[in-house]
A protein has these predicted regions:
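Short linear sequence motif anchored by a di-proline
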Residues: 1-214
Length: 214
């Protein structure tokens, strides 16, 4: 699963890389993005491409497929049939992150893509209008099984949209969902860089525990 990611890039870099025509939200670089956070997503075919805001986690937020949607399930489950055909998006990202805890120590693991500092994760989005007419937009990250050398840290990784796949993925006119199965291959160790850092435990002093200054 992908439960944390970073986007350490600004609007101009995102616009240039993904050929965005209209930026419709403010963006500041973030080192940690979590489920239910608002995130930028890219939608629309060429000449109509927009960078818009969405909440990470499809309706309902507590559902199993809320923040991640396995590619096999997306292509076979009826619940995804409508949005995989015409509500695809790209979620820009600079690294995928996680925290591992074996009970003795914690370590943070981050994965970056060797092809580009900034890359696009395949996403699906949904829009609902409340009784007051306000639009609520949510999204999920499409994942697939990790490839050789990566499976030790992840059971599922985001599907990465290459530059060659960008136009077709964002074109709502491309509605043959089964074409995607053969297009996307798992990320192998030679595609990515993985960084592991041991998280230092906080050392409490008497003054800290008593509310004083260490």
């Amino acid at each position: 699963m992908c439960q944390l990611f970073a986007l350490e890039a600004g609007a101009e870099e995102i616009r240039d890389q993904f050929r965005v025509n209209k930026v419709m939200m403010e963006i500041s670089p973030r080192k940690q993005i979590e489920p239910t956070d608002n995130v930028p997503i890219i939608v629309g075919k060429q000449q109509e491409r927009r960078l818009i805001e969405s909440r990470w986690g499809l309706f309902p937020f507590w559902a199993k497929d809320s923040i991640n949607a396995d590619l096999d399930g997306v292509l076979t489950k009826e619940i995804f049939d409508r949005i995989i055909k015409k509500q695809r998006c790209i979620i820009p990202c600079t690294s995928v992150c996680k925290v591992e805890d074996d009970g003795k120590q914690k370590q943070s693991v981050s994965l970056t893509y060797k092809g580009s500092r900034l890359f696009g994760m395949a996403g699906l989005y949904e829009e609902r209008v409340d009784p007051r007419g306000q639009v609520h937009r949510t999204c999920t990250i499409v994942t697939t099984a990790p490839g050789l050398g990566v499976e030790h840290h992840w059971k599922g990784l985001p599907v990465i949209i290459s530059e060659d796949e960008l136009e077709e993925w964002l074109d709502p006119g491309m509605r043959e969902k089964n074409m995607w199965q053969s297009r996307f291959t798992p990320l192998h160790a030679d595609h990515v860089s993985i960084k592991v850092e041991i998280e230092e435990p906080v050392k409490f002093t008497f003054q800290m525990l008593a509310g004083g200054r260490a």
